[in-house]
């Protein structure tokens, strides 16, 4: 980065990807400031670190700035963007700033439609346990670090590679993981799945000739792109042909136990793994971290310890403990960021394994009208796998409502399918009381979605405490 650039301002600082980059740059010695539309715990934490934060966007926030970083949510007519353009201050997309950070280290980029945050966290934890002291920028809060970013002194930087706006094509990693490829954010790719797959191939081709692609070949779309990938590949999955493979997989409470077989060129001894996460989808995420560890010669003991002691990621199968039920007994509250049908299905399956025999109550807030429209039938099928459903209105994320792609339409479709009788909750603020009114002793309540439903578990505990 040019030494003339010292003061960097972030528009949309409260976002998980933005705040992580800002924190790393702050720790590198840059003078960081940033703004967001509303105050948040993230802004408050960054302020405590010494970063100047603003609530609201205004041209006056750019008093002394050499460069401006924007998130994809920031519009071109944002007053701070307009002020920067007028002053000829460079306006840099978030992904380009992340790419600049990666130039300082050897980059390990985690891509895929689902599982990026957990996988990035697992890889960072394994490298940290091995003493490699990685830098990481994650889309969620790594519980063991208490943050979503950290500047390490080691050679590696582990980052999420975001395909939602194709910005991962700005990154230049030396190692890349692809967890899966699924139809999401299709407006970016002209609603053509072939374009999405090509973008992943192009992403992998941004690695140098000595780079390694670590691919989950259980995923059909990932298997389809393998012949087009020219760099060395390590495959992982449950399939017999996977070079890093999980066998003897079994849930034990909220953990997964399995044996990892590793046979990429040289066959290594089987590795007995205790993973402190629930669900077979997280076994796949752990396999990718094991594959990275093999490439970097991480000792087996470090891999085993990191996975067994993994403390999880905020909003990923996060437990809020037990809450008294109206009719007696207690119900367990779990919160998860999953908002695509594939993610919801995997998380419900994980809950079945972690809490066998217990009734699953899904409190779900759909995220984006376009996703609800494009995945409508899949949502009906997956949501119907719960034993009871509390359905919120769609979290718009800035989108305009779409007819027949809202929460009421989903509730109606579930009734027509005859799977269950959902409770529609029109205002998310009413969800905590709706949960208290409907949950029974022994239930597991899953609060799921990428929007404001993330606030529901905390408000539920407050409401229960006040009664």
From Swiss-Prot:
<comment type="pathway">
    <text>Cell wall biogenesis; peptidoglycan biosynthesis.</text>
</comment>
<dbReference type="Pfam" id="PF08245">
    <property type="entry name" value="Mur_ligase_M"/>
</dbReference>
<dbReference type="GO" id="GO:0005524">
    <property type="term" value="F:ATP binding"/>
</dbReference>
<dbReference type="InterPro" id="IPR036615">
    <property type="entry name" value="Mur_ligase_C_dom_sf"/>
</dbReference>
<keyword id="KW-0133">Cell shape</keyword>
<dbReference type="Pfam" id="PF01225">
    <property type="entry name" value="Mur_ligase"/>
</dbReference>
<dbReference type="InterPro" id="IPR005758">
    <property type="entry name" value="UDP-N-AcMur_Ala_ligase_MurC"/>
</dbReference>
<dbReference type="Pfam" id="PF02875">
    <property type="entry name" value="Mur_ligase_C"/>
</dbReference>
<keyword id="KW-0132">Cell division</keyword>
<keyword id="KW-0547">Nucleotide-binding</keyword>
<protein>
    <recommendedName>
        <fullName>UDP-N-acetylmuramate--L-alanine ligase</fullName>
        <ecNumber>6.3.2.8</ecNumber>
    </recommendedName>
</protein>
<dbReference type="InterPro" id="IPR004101">
    <property type="entry name" value="Mur_ligase_C"/>
</dbReference>
<dbReference type="InterPro" id="IPR036565">
    <property type="entry name" value="Mur-like_cat_sf"/>
</dbReference>
<keyword id="KW-0963">Cytoplasm</keyword>
<keyword id="KW-0067">ATP-binding</keyword>
<dbReference type="InterPro" id="IPR000713">
    <property type="entry name" value="Mur_ligase_N"/>
</dbReference>
<dbReference type="GO" id="GO:0009252">
    <property type="term" value="P:peptidoglycan biosynthetic process"/>
</dbReference>
<keyword id="KW-0573">Peptidoglycan synthesis</keyword>
<dbReference type="InterPro" id="IPR050061">
    <property type="entry name" value="MurCDEF_pg_biosynth"/>
</dbReference>
<keyword id="KW-0131">Cell cycle</keyword>
<dbReference type="GO" id="GO:0051301">
    <property type="term" value="P:cell division"/>
</dbReference>
<dbReference type="InterPro" id="IPR013221">
    <property type="entry name" value="Mur_ligase_cen"/>
</dbReference>
<comment type="similarity">
    <text>Belongs to the MurCDEF family.</text>
</comment>
<dbReference type="GO" id="GO:0008763">
    <property type="term" value="F:UDP-N-acetylmuramate-L-alanine ligase activity"/>
</dbReference>
<dbReference type="GO" id="GO:0005737">
    <property type="term" value="C:cytoplasm"/>
</dbReference>
<feature type="binding site">
    <location>
        <begin position="112"/>
        <end position="118"/>
    </location>
    <ligand>
        <name>ATP</name>
    </ligand>
</feature>
<dbReference type="GO" id="GO:0071555">
    <property type="term" value="P:cell wall organization"/>
</dbReference>
<comment type="function">
    <text>Cell wall formation.</text>
</comment>
<keyword id="KW-0961">Cell wall biogenesis/degradation</keyword>
<keyword id="KW-0436">Ligase</keyword>
<dbReference type="GO" id="GO:0008360">
    <property type="term" value="P:regulation of cell shape"/>
</dbReference>
